[in-house]
């Protein structure tokens, strides 16, 4: 089962209540926040409902490892370190990321890891408008493997 990275692109002004509730269920309360979800029909329905405010795609293990290493936070706002992952799970961050992508483990298996990754705005900006879909040359909606390039620019 693939993992999807979901990033909130647009703000919270004039957001309809069902979309706002969906974004809250995804824990995307602020712009440039990222969460990792499973590729299941229930999550895909939520993503479709909020597609005018988010972008998503399949994340790879290399990008997930960089995301955890650079932007992962533990409760108490402490950074995730190789030593912490080694102590709790007995493996490196790269091995953990690979197991998460393969579905053998979940991000919840790392104790005290916050589920939301706070990212910077992308270096070089969004290509095109923040109000149009990715297929139309904007920034919103499904972007497949290209989500990895966007996350690299936002780390």
Swiss-Prot record:
Alphabetically, the GO molecular function entries are: RNA binding; structural constituent of ribosome
Keywords recorded for this protein, A-Z: Ribonucleoprotein, Ribosomal protein
Report the PROSITE patterns cross-referenced here.
RIBOSOMAL_L30
InterPro entries found in the cross-reference section? Ribo_uL30_ferredoxin-like_sf (IPR036919), Ribosomal_uL30 (IPR039699), Ribosomal_uL30_arc (IPR005997), Ribosomal_uL30_CS (IPR018038), Ribosomal_uL30_euk_arc (IPR035808), Ribosomal_uL30_ferredoxin-like (IPR016082)
Assembly state and interactors?
Part of the 50S ribosomal subunit.
For this entry, the protein name equals: Large ribosomal subunit protein uL30
Tell me which Pfam families the record gives.
Ribosomal_L30 (PF00327)
What GO CC annotations are associated with the protein? cytosolic large ribosomal subunit
State the source organism's domain of life: Archaea
Gene encoding it? rpl30
PANTHER family given in the database record: 60S RIBOSOMAL PROTEIN L7, LARGE RIBOSOMAL SUBUNIT PROTEIN UL30
A GO BP entry: maturation of LSU-rRNA from tricistronic rRNA transcript (SSU-rRNA, 5.8S rRNA, LSU-rRNA)
